[in-house]
Design a protein with these regions (language model features):
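Accessory beta-strand-rich segments of carbohydrate-active enzymes
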Residues: 28-30, 40, 78-200, 230, ...
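Active-site mouth of glycoside hydrolases
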Residues: 125-129, 138, 155, 164, ...
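Short acidic/polar inter-strand loop motif in beta-rich domains
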Residues: 149-156, 295-301, 324
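Surface beta-strand/loop "capping" patches
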Residues: 188-230
Length: 396
């Protein structure tokens, strides 16, 4: 009996099993059970390609991360590599939308799903997303394959232009998939993802205005870009609920109902004054969770949770003001790769908090990310530890 149980378990090793949807929107960590091969095999895009001898890795995992601090950055290996992942989606996801989000690949990548080419991403730093819905085999095995070239001298195919910031003497080249990957499953009426690269969508935007620091009040705005992929009109109610750091609901409000036509993209808005606010500040990373939801005929069909803080800033008389107080800016310039020995830039979130928290402990209130955008994890980390971030325009 023991051998039969072991055989049953081994049958499922190597194929990610994604559980049935448990809410109106599901976001799955898509980092586990990838396969990596260093070298170029054009046939690796095919579904039936034999990858059983490839290296098993968990993302984020650049192929050359173990070279970090062992080699000088100008000596980091650059080559072509392939990543593949086998996964299944439950059959009851068939009438849903499925998106994949890569927080970043370096330098250029070709993406395939079930042998079909779905797109090219040439950036090296920023996130990209793809709509997998037309290609998914529900209840069956699916294969995603990604061919990546991290050549130091990589040039855009359309223009023959090099990346301005890709320099052997500066920006450490950890090639492949050095950042997280997520799978999103939504209703066909949904709030878009903030993935302008390829998807051309902007997602949810939460901000505050009319901030009154002394009375701890502000008007909080929520905006969601939504899309209706049903074949009929949808009358949509837009609701917003704000939760404090401890998870307590402090305000609920909603916008006017809107009719969204089939295939139409629209922006829904709502705002309300909130009192008793804690304002985000240096060393005080107070964050709220704002849930924006879509309702049709009294039923919630989509919900997105956004973590954010509220602060008041002003520039005048040669000074910077934060929450109505003058603040002298001082801090560090940090390479966006921000690497650690043996793992490169692909560190867990707690290590990002430790690294960024050290700057706050050292009396810094500002980090200037150098030349290219940092990854999402560092942005969120600085929000948590209370560190102001700056990145110069025109160099990203």
């Amino acid at each position: 009996m023991r051998n039969k149980i072991l055989l049953f378990l081994l049958t499922f090793i190597g194929i990610s099993q994604i559980a049935a949807a448990s809410s109106v929107r599901d976001k799955y960590n898509f980092n586990s059970e990838w396969l990596l091969y260093v070298g170029d095999i054009p046939e690796a895009k095919e579904v039936r390609f034999q990858d059983t001898d490839w290296k098993k890795v968990t993302l984020p995992r650049p192929f050359n991360e173990d070279e970090a601090f062992r080699l000088s950055i100008e000596q980091l290996t650059d080559t072509v590599m392939w990543y593949r992942k086998h996964f299944r989606l439950p059959a009851d996801s068939k009438n849903k939308k499925v998106f994949v989000e890569f927080e970043g690949v370096r330098q250029g990548a070709d993406f395939y799903i079930n042998g079909e080419y779905i797109g090219l991403h040439e950036n090296g730093a920023m996130a990209v997303g793809f709509d997998l819905t037309p290609y998914i085999k529900y209840g069956q095995e699916n294969v995603m394959a990604v061919r990546i070239d991290n050549n130091w001298n990589y040039k855009e195919r359309a223009t023959g232009t090099k990346y301005q910031w890709s320099d052997r003497n500066f920006n450490a080249n950890y090639g492949g998939i050095p950042k997280n990957v997520w799978l999103h499953v939504t209703d066909k009426l949904y709030q878009t993802l903030p993935l302008y690269s390829n998807l051309k969508t902007t997602g949810v935007y939460i901000y505050a205005e009319d901030i009154r620091v002394k009375s701890r009040k502000a008007v909080v705005h929520a905006e969601s870009e939504i899309k209706n992929e049903y074949n009929r009109d949808k009358k949509v109610a837009y609701k917003v609920e704000v939760f404090d750091r401890d998870g307590k609901s402090i305000k609920s409000f909603e916008g006017t109902q809107t009719v969204v036509k089939p295939g139409e993209t629209a922006t829904l808005e709502a705002s309300a004054e909130i009192d008793g606010l804690h304002f985000w500040s240096w060393g005080y990373g107070y964050l709220y969770t704002v849930k924006t939801s879509l309702w049709v005929d009294g039923r919630k069909v989509d919900e997105v949770a956004t973590r954010t803080g509220f602060r008041k800033t002003r520039f005048g008389k040669g000074m910077i003001w934060l929450n109505d107080r003058v603040i002298q800016m001082k801090g560090f310039a940090q390479r966006t790769s921000n690497e650690w020995p043996g793992v490169g830039m692909s560190v867990p979130a707690w290590l990002s908090d430790y690294s960024n928290g050290l700057m706050v402990e050292d009396n810094a209130n500002l980090v200037r990310w150098m030349h290219i955008t940092p990854w999402k994890q560092d942005i969120e980390s600085c929000d948590r530890v209370g560190l102001i971030q700056a990145m110069q325009a025109g160099d990203a």
